[in-house]
A protein has these predicted regions:
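Short acidic, gly/pro-rich beta-turn/loop elements at beta-sheet edges
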Residues: 35, 48, 58
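A short, exposed loop/beta-hairpin motif centered on an aromatic-Gly-Thr core
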Residues: 44-55
Length: 94
């Protein structure tokens, strides 16, 4: 299948995975229990809740990768509010 011109210019998924998205963690009460809510507000729908901050961060990382993959596979726009920490196009992952 031929690649469209805009797809040829699109960075690979690793490029987007290296973007340092804002991270927000807060304590929230749900049904009499305190949970930690973690989110990347710049990525639509990238939010999780867990009993501890560590668990929330671990779950958020999995969710971030799912959201990026879903946007990537769907050809949607992926927010890039700041440059990646590393540019996978010039420094391939080992």
């Amino acid at each position: 299948m031929a690649m469209r011109a805009e797809e040829a210019d699109r960075p690979d998924l690793a490029y987007y995975e290296a973007v340092p998205y804002l991270l927000v963690i807060e304590s929230v009460e749900r049904h009499g229990q305190w949970l930690r809510r973690a989110e990347h507000p710049e990525l639509p729908g990238c939010v999780v809740e867990a009993p501890s901050a560590v668990e929330a961060l671990e779950e958020l990382e999995r969710e971030r990768r799912r959201v990026l993959r879903r946007l990537w596979d769907g050809g949607g726009l992926i927010p890039v509010p700041r440059p990646p920490l590393r540019d996978s196009r010039s420094h391939p992952a080992t």
